[in-house]
Amino acid sequence: MNRASAVFLDRDGIINRAIVRDGKPYPPVRMQDFEILPGSVTALSQLADFGYTLIGITNQPDVARGTQSREMVESFNALIQSKLPVREIFVCYHDNADDCNCRKPRPGLILQAAQKYQLDLSNSWMVGDRWKDIAAGQAAGLKTIFVDYHYSETYQGSPATYIVEETFSIAPIILKGSK
């Protein structure tokens, strides 16, 4: 059986707009703050049309911290899946102190998705806007694209395979790499 190639996508900042405060990105808290990025609509449609399986991978520690409800996170994810060709969104609800394997920069969620959907990680990609996204992708053996919004945080780890400044730029890079 042939394994499918996938594009793993961080949620906040890649699929939907992150809320930036003091130079740091945060997930939206209320539905009225939630906005799917226009560039992601175009890019993800192109990738799905080419045959990539699209999977969301997101850390949502605000649930563990008590500042966001799991129901609201699930509502955002359901809205994404109703508007975009994203197969599933895998979520880590743990905080840093929980030391779990699913929280990026560890690759646990990527590996779960790969097993569930029989994905070929050697021909797959991770797209993210923070160093933890890129590190998780690299740990899983993926090619990586860092969408650099110039947040006020230090990039840690190895450089991404590619660096872009907008989500809409990811599709041409990935599709060119597929030929």
What is each of the regions a protein language model found here?
Residues 12, 61, 106:
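Anionic group-transfer/hydrolysis microenvironments
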Residues 17-19, 93, 148:
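Residue-level signal for short segments within beta-strands and strand-turn junctions
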Residues 40-73, 77, 86-98, 137:
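Substrate-recognition element of Asp-dependent hydrolases with the DxDx(T/V) motif
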Residues 1-55:
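Active-site neighborhood of HAD-like aspartate-dependent phosphohydrolases
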Residues 29-37, 66-70, 103, 160:
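Flexible, glycine- and charge-enriched loops at secondary-structure boundaries
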Residues 24-27, 63-66, 96-100, 153-156:
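A short acidic, helix-capping loop that chelates divalent metal ions and anchors anionic groups
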